[in-house]
């Protein structure tokens, strides 16, 4: 699939990754946020497009919920979450009058905003655009894929937890990707065990290995397991940069490894 010649505001974006999950509560927005931070610390310019219209949590995760979106000649200027302007973010959370307002919209209005997000945000030059989607396979997902299709997305990253219910939902997500022609770049198993901070033993609080087995059976890459980590939860609650502040934490090696694999996939083949 060729990239559109008239790319508009996405013409300077090198790689677009959609982060999907079959169900809510698996930590999809967490993975989106932490991968963006890890890519940023690898020297890349990263944008995050939050199209989870009914649950926009990323502004809080990046301590950006009090910031405003401004207009320029080419559309909306995204919110920059660091002084170096190496991470930019667009979310409906910035457009609500009050942060606790509910988005009670029917499909056509949601789809129209998603199309506007895809065309009217002045991202500038980015190495990666991470698109955080709602759970499931709904109108919003179809609208997102259709809006980004002309720009040849790198693919979809699927997030699951070890339980059979979550893995079953991701199977349906794989079917969605196949039907819409969206390449799957990998599966991540989140909340995969708890590492004791004292003895470093990993206890599988849920089940084990569901995401890896699904990746094997589906013939898609398995990018790794991210364990439950109180420091990761703390950083998200406080809007801190987990990758920078907690390099010795249990989840850090897994997140760094996932980011490295994405960088390898994005590198030109020799």
Swiss-Prot record:
ATP binds at residues 22-29. Heterotetramer of 2 nubp1 and 2 nubp2 chains. Coiled coil: none annotated. This is Cytosolic Fe-S cluster assembly factor nubp2. Binds 4 [4Fe-4S] clusters per heterotetramer. Contains two stable clusters in the N-termini of nubp1 and two labile, bridging clusters between subunits of the nubp1-nubp2 heterotetramer. GO terms for molecular function: 4 iron, 4 sulfur cluster binding; ATP binding; ATP-dependent FeS chaperone activity; metal ion binding. Belongs to the Mrp/NBP35 ATP-binding proteins family. NUBP2/CFD1 subfamily. The lineage of its organism: Eukaryota, Metazoa, Chordata, Craniata, Vertebrata. Component of the cytosolic iron-sulfur (Fe/S) protein assembly (CIA) machinery. Required for maturation of extramitochondrial Fe-S proteins. The nubp1-nubp2 heterotetramer forms a Fe-S scaffold complex, mediating the de novo assembly of an Fe-S cluster and its transfer to target apoproteins. Its main location: cytoplasm. [4Fe-4S] cluster binds at residues 196, 199. It holds the Pfam family ParA. GO terms for cellular component: cytoplasm. InterPro entries: Mrp-like_CS, Mrp/NBP35_ATP-bd, NUBP2/Cfd1_eukaryotes, P-loop_NTPase, YlxH/NBP35. HAMAP family: Mrp_NBP35, NUBP2. SUPFAM superfamilies: P-loop containing nucleoside triphosphate hydrolases. It is found in: Cytoplasm. PANTHER family: CYTOSOLIC FE-S CLUSTER ASSEMBLY FACTOR NUBP2, NUCLEOTIDE-BINDING PROTEIN NBP35 YEAST -RELATED. Its cofactor is [4Fe-4S] cluster. One of its GO terms (biological process) is iron-sulfur cluster assembly. Keywords: 4Fe-4S, ATP-binding, Cytoplasm, Iron, Iron-sulfur, Metal-binding, Nucleotide-binding.
